[in-house]
């Protein structure tokens, strides 16, 4: 993590210095924990120990110290979103008393330009879908637009990096599209503007190869088998923004079946671990 990325995480994720810790061996730093804190809880954003000092209990001590502090200062809920591929990190949280609450799936849409919606079983179904979208418009939207219409509420579980607080903090980095009728917004898609990432900035210059467009919100408010979301994805793909990446999707946020209908496929998993802070540093309460 670079100094610039750390500064951005303070703004975007609400990293608190009081929730950050360093383990020392003499005067040498050998471990670090970076925590982000909101009224709902604390996220263990980063935890790492120098390779020469692993398997000596330093990481567990950092977690226990954070727990003891939060037992006094609050909030008591502590979470971590750990890549499933990091087996040692998953074991660390399990051994420290954390309980797995959910699997968060990374989805990719590798070729929006080649996307072809599933063919309806008969002509009447195709005609119904076309009629349902008649009189609707695809319009640009912002985070502020959705907030003003009450469409950014915490109606379902969201991961830290795509929570309302993060979207609001990053609103200048985020653009969006929506399907709207004369009366309301019926579906929307928010994405990070190309060239900007959570741990980078537009000033850093373009990458050596195109990066996936990161989707940070994908919602429909109409039962239409995903037709409105397909329209938004097709519009975004037509603008040359591809491929798409939709990270850390909670199973209660949007169904796997709908995402597969839209053309997404799973590409990775994070484990969501949680515990409650306790002043007794030797154990956690799930």
Locations of the language-model features?
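Amide-forming acyltransferase catalytic core, primarily the GNAT-like/NAT-type
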Residues: 1-3, 95-209
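Conserved GNAT acetyl-CoA-binding A-motif
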Residues: 70-83, 239-250
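Conserved active-site alpha-helix within GNAT-family acetyltransferase domains
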Residues: 60, 84-103, 250-268
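Conserved acetyl-CoA binding element of GNAT-fold acetyltransferases
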Residues: 40-52, 198-224
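Structural motif
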Residues: 82-83, 192-194, 217-223, 246-252
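Conserved acetyl-CoA-binding loop-helix of GNAT-fold acetyltransferases
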Residues: 49, 55-68, 95, 222-238
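A short helix-loop-beta-strand connector motif used in the catalytic cores of GNAT acetyltransferases and
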Residues: 8-22, 28-31, 43, 165-178, ...
